[in-house]
């Protein structure tokens, strides 16, 4: 199974890149994590936010691999603790499809992305900066993988 992280935004601070790459490089060859960055729409004083979201959504959905399960990262989504995420990861593996996780930009996800999703995952009831979500998702997925394989990374 392959994991795709499709995220709005292309110019991340160095500390985000460093943190994300640290976890990306830890993933096993049989479950690689791929980052696909979607350019954020230009936001200005008179920007049409609805149109920007729509365009970002179109680009995100176009980047999803054919037949992939789509999971959105969204505050109202399901809240999985680490053991539940590990169970979810096992279910995804058994499903036999790759998984695309969608992270929206500053205004969130386009309605089309939410409609296309089979699942929605909430990391927290807190609003997080979307660049930080990349690092948190990568670490959470790596930790969940470590539980499913009895790797010593996760400790109770």
UniProtKB/Swiss-Prot annotation:
Domain of life of the native organism: Bacteria
An MF annotation (GO) of this entry: rRNA (pseudouridine-N3-)-methyltransferase activity
Residues annotated for S-adenosyl-L-methionine binding in this entry: 73, 104, 123-128
Annotated localization: Cytoplasm
Keywords: Cytoplasm, Methyltransferase, rRNA processing, S-adenosyl-L-methionine, Transferase
Main subcellular location of this protein, as a coarse class: cytoplasm
Residue spans crossing the bilayer: none
Its EC number(s): 2.1.1.177
Enzyme class: transferase
Reactions performed catalytically: pseudouridine(1915) in 23S rRNA + S-adenosyl-L-methionine = N(3)-methylpseudouridine(1915) in 23S rRNA + S-adenosyl-L-homocysteine + H(+)
Gene Ontology CC annotations of this record: cytoplasm
InterPro entries reported in the protein's UniProt record: Alpha/beta_knot_MTases, RlmH-like, tRNA_m1G_MTases_N
PANTHER family registered for this protein in UniProt: METHYLTRANSFERASE (PTHR33603), RIBOSOMAL RNA LARGE SUBUNIT METHYLTRANSFERASE H (PTHR33603:SF1)
Similarity-based family: Belongs to the RNA methyltransferase RlmH family.
Subunit details: Homodimer.
Job description of the protein: Specifically methylates the pseudouridine at position 1915 (m3Psi1915) in 23S rRNA.
HAMAP family the record matches: 23SrRNA_methyltr_H (MF_00658)
Protein name (Swiss-Prot/TrEMBL): Ribosomal RNA large subunit methyltransferase H
Species whose genome carries this gene: Proteus mirabilis (strain HI4320)
